[in-house]
Amino acid sequence: IEENRQDITAKVIETKADIGIAWDGDADSCFFIDGTGEFVAGDFITALLAEAFLIRTPGSKVVYDVRASYAVNDIVAKYQGSALMNRVGHAFFKKRMREEDAVFGGEVTGHYYFRDFYYADNGFLPALLLLELMSKKNCTLADLLAPLREKYFISAEINTKVASMDLVNAKLDGLASQYADGHVYRIDGVSAEFPDWHFNVRASNTEPLLRLNLEATTQAVMEQKRDAILGFIRS
């Protein structure tokens, strides 16, 4: 939540730090701020850490969630690894990590999973691994992210309240029908892939809420498609 990271963002800028690191209340998830004060998307961190693991163990499996940037898939493919898409949620991730003997897994929400940590999530290992990566390359976090930010344009998660759970399901079915000319799959909510963009819309597990994540190859396409889907959800 943006208001919860205002203090660390201000401190990073004030001290001219190369990186800011924050944890949630029980420290099982980890979040990052770059040296410019910009929040770093969890799927970009997943991509960076996947690369680090695959350099050490080429051809390994990496688990990522349905909302993630193509950056993850592209980097895993670059190192001849296997990128395994999965449902959102730590219970589903831990099960899949163990079943596949995956070396690493990452969720957009800042949960990261490690084969060497019993296939479970850990909030401190991502920070240590990212600091190691920065040290080895003698660069800042913003430097590591620059190639990703130039190529992948993501919306971040956008939440929309819906009147009822029945309407949530109707909207999901409507999206699947409206975007049927793409590659549609329903691993978790509705996802659709096109040559220059893709999206996932999924329901909250606890309230009548739809969550949109979208990515495109340009900022303009991302904004256009984002607004179109939000218009449908909110109509």
Language-model segment annotations:
Residues 1-33:
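N-terminal small/polar loop signature for handling phosphorylated ligands or for N-terminal nucleophile
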Residues 1-6, 39, 79-81, 102-104:
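Short, hinge-like loop/turn segments at secondary-structure boundaries
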Residues 4-7, 45, 49:
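Well-ordered alpha-helical segments embedded in enzymatic catalytic cores
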Residues 19, 55-213, 218-235:
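Phosphate-binding and adjacent anionic-ligand microenvironments
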Residues 23-25, 39-44, 118-121:
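Short glycine/threonine-rich catalytic loop with a Thr-x-Gly-x-Asp
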Residues 25, 36, 44-45, 67, ...:
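Short, ordered loop/turn segments at secondary-structure junctions
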Residues 28-47, 72-73:
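Short Gly/Thr/Asp-enriched flexible loops that form oxyanion-binding sites at enzyme active sites
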Residues 48-56:
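A conserved helix-loop-strand patch within extracytoplasmic ligand-binding domains
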